Amino acid sequence: MLKEEVLRLKREKNAVILAHNYQLPEVKDVADFIGDSLNLSMEAARTKADIIVFAGVYFMAETAAILNPDKKVLIPDPGAGCSLASSVSAADVLEWRRRHPNGVVVAYINTYAEVKAVSDYVCTSANCLKIIEAIPSDRPVLFLPDKYLGLYIKAKTGREIDIWDGECHVHAKITSPKITAKIKLYRDAEVLIHPECGCGTACLLELPKMGLSPKFLSTEGMVKYVKQSPARRFIIATEVGIIDRLEREAPGKEYIPAAEDAICEYMKLITLDKVHRSLKEEIYRVVVPEDIAKKARLAIERMFEFA
């Protein structure tokens, strides 16, 4: 079977497979680590493997390559892009900096290496609030590229933030009316929302008026939360692939997607067959030019200080 062959190749080649929470179940089945962007970046930084197969989208594999310049980082499908990462370029950031010379650029991890290289900090949804709150109040904050995450940060911290106009096309379709409709159907459910969602700010303001206390969490935060919560039913507002992970980690509970169509087609490009071929033939290596990697590494390492 293909699964057993992948496991055999991992042992022979001293390889590790890192799989994002949104990956297909068949890919998670052969992964050594499953997690969100922050956790997988940390695993990539400390792995002793010679080969890293990154089952995720391209910017994630780039981050692993930046942190492991001497290791072979493979992505099973180099076409696994990201609409959010593609919404901003290094040239855009440099022009933004020119207009705000005293600004501190905070780049969400969903950006390509060239953008990280011209940013001061990289953040994830798990540590963005800590990073923003650590920036001196007299320095303007330039946050990119996700406008919904930026608005959430602005609402939570009270900081004036200049926000880039980008979005994740998957999370953008998770709207406040969709959340409200699910709440009416499942009144006993806890509501867990990824801060990239299009509903974020509205839910932050409106749901408490309905007597609800929505939890805004990274995908890894969702996993931790459902494991310790006494609740038996949850409305999950993020890409639907996380539900498989939740069922693995906290079985016996009910997980209702806020939007059944919240599916990242880029994540789903990675299949078990492609993982097998990439590992067997050691193809689709991700290499970041050293001049870009060196600068991007600084911003990524600052992110780890707030992990």
Swiss-Prot record:
Asked if the Swiss-Prot or TrEMBL record annotates the protein with the keyword Mitochondrion, the reply is: no
The residues that hold [4Fe-4S] cluster are C82, C168, C264
Annotated positions binding iminosuccinate = H20, S37, Y108, I109, N110, S125, H194, P195, E196, T219
The protein's Enzyme Commission number = 2.5.1.72
Annotated TM spans:
none
Location relative to the cell = Cytoplasm
- What name has this protein been given in UniProt? Quinolinate synthase
- Gene that this polypeptide is encoded by: nadA
